[in-house]
Curated annotation (Swiss-Prot):
InterPro entries: BTB/POZ_dom, SKP1/BTB/POZ_sf, Znf_C2H2_sf, Znf_C2H2_type. Residues 1-107 form the BTB domain. SUPFAM superfamilies: beta-beta-alpha zinc fingers (SSF57667), POZ domain (SSF54695). Keywords: DNA-binding, Isopeptide bond, Metal-binding, Nucleus, Repeat, Transcription, Transcription regulation, Ubl conjugation, Zinc, Zinc-finger. Pfam families: BTB, zf-C2H2. One of its GO terms (molecular function) is DNA-binding transcription repressor activity, RNA polymerase II-specific. This is Zinc finger and BTB domain-containing protein 25.
């Protein structure tokens, strides 16, 4: 087998893989231009890449455009894979600087000879970041470029504009050799027309369509009209996550959450929730047990605040049964009831009217008497020898018909009511203990 033909087949296969980005294990990024290549080929011709691949395992090698320009690298990359330079003219000084940067001494004399073969009169072209824009009338395939002339079948002003500004069609990988020119010439004109009409998909498929630029710079008035109508129809209901109330605007929801933060409501909310961008943008409320319970508590608090003046005029009091008081823990410190709420629980108890917090139940009860203009009377709860009576002392106004000499509390005494104010019902006790 001929060694020369074997090497030629190998180079052609590697170059084809580079063109379509297939089986390439390396990407060289120069600015915003990306080149697919093989590590072995780059390391064989450049000591710069050889040292990088030895000490680095990254698949993307980033190079600054100030070190080597994309058109110079594309020129040298084509020589590495084909052994011959593309039909284009590059600046000789910049070419030498790029070769010195890559430490590709072997490519120095080849690139110089190839650059001197073509004179500026034979090929007049401009290379911009690897995209070749040709001014000739025939199809020319360059580095990373496929220039096609506008089809003659087009009529009208659009045909004239496309004739002055030919469209650009790029392959999947930047870099095509001259071997594919015959295949590109065989493509029918209908496929070229379809390629002209397709919009750009990625960075590697840039197009010089003046009409598309004009359409982008001057948007149609229909799009401007439909914009506000879409925003008006997309109004969302703002929902409080802590008590279940709904609001029409975000500002009302933010003011409502301030009441949670300040402690006016029995649900503690962190202050950072007020600075959230997605405040109140929630889905419709699920009718689960937690939401129903939260709404019930919030409506109860509002109802109690409205009925507050009526309670001050009443002389009678509702007794709190021992069965209700038994919900309170026997510990000296307040505990948390198992209410399965989603908000955070705190040890302190807050007043449902003004929001003040107290560490003990007795202090909270004394504070609630101040809202009614009455003085809290400690002496009305007589001390008993039994420890159970001492725990219930802050919630009792009087224990009637009990002898001071008795050493225990009988079952009849446990059935007697405790004279508390009417607000301390079962729901009020739950509200006081849970925050």
């Amino acid at each position: 087998m001929d060694t020369a033909s074997h090497s030629l087949v190998l180079l052609q296969q590697l170059n084809m893989q580079r063109e379509f980005g297939f089986l390439c294990d390396c990407t060289v990024a120069i600015g915003d231009v990306y080149f697919k290549a093989h590590r072995a080929v780059l390391a064989a011709f450049s000591n710069y890449f050889k040292m990088i691949f030895i000490h680095q395992t990254s698949e993307c090698i980033k190079i600054q455009p100030t070190d080597i320009q994309p058109d110079i690298f594309s020129y040298l990359l084509h020589i590495m894979y084909t052994g011959k330079g593309p039909k284009q003219i590059v600046d000789h000084s910049r070419l030498e600087e790029g070769i010195r940067f890559l430490h590709a001494d072997y490519l120095s004399h080849i690139a110089t000879e190839m650059n001197q073969v073509f004179s500026p009169e034979t090929v007049q072209s401009s290379n911009l970041y690897g995209i070749q824009i040709s001014t000739t009338q025939k199809t020319v395939v360059k580095q990373g470029l496929e220039v096609k002339e506008a089809p003659s079948s087009n009529s009208g002003n659009r045909a004239a504009v496309q004739g002055d500004h030919p469209q650009l069609q790029l392959s999947l990988a930047i870099g095509l050799d001259d071997g594919t020119a015959d295949q590109q010439r065989a493509c029918p004109a209908t496929q070229a027309l379809e390629e002209h009409q397709k919009p750009p998909v990625s960075i590697k498929q840039e197009r010089c369509d003046p009409e598309s630029v004009i359409s982008q710079s001057h948007p149609s008035p229909s799009s401007e009209v439909t914009g506000p109508t879409f925003t008006e129809n997309s109004i969302k209901i703002h929902l409080c996550h802590y008590c279940g109330e709904r609001f029409d605007s975000r500002s009302n929801l933010r003011q409502h959450l301030h009441t949670h933060v300040s402690g006016s409501l029995p649900f503690g909310v962190p202050a950072s929730i007020l600075e959230s961008n997605d405040l109140g943008e929630v889905h419709p409320l699920n009718e689960n047990s937690e939401a129903l319970e939260c709404r019930r508590l919030s409506s109860f608090i509002v109802k109690e605040n409205e009925q507050q003046p009526d309670h001050t005029n009443r002389g009678t009091t509702e007794p709190l049964q021992i069965s209700q008081v038994s919900l309170i823990s026997k510990d000296t410190e307040p505990v948390e009831l198992n209410c399965n709420f989603s908000f955070s629980r705190k040890r302190k108890m807050s007043c449902t009217i003004c929001g003040h917090k107290f560490p003990r139940k007795s202090q909270l009860l004394e504070h609630m008497y101040t809202h009614k203009g009455k003085s809290y009377r400690y002496n009305r709860c007589q001390r008993f020898g039994n420890a159970l009576a001492q725990r219930f002392q802050p919630y009792c106004d009087s224990w009637s018909d009990v002898s001071l000499k008795s050493s225990r509390l009988s079952q009849e005494h446990l059935d007697l009511p405790c004279a508390l104010e009417s607000e301390l019902t079962q729901e009020n006790v739950d509200t006081i203990l849970v925050e």
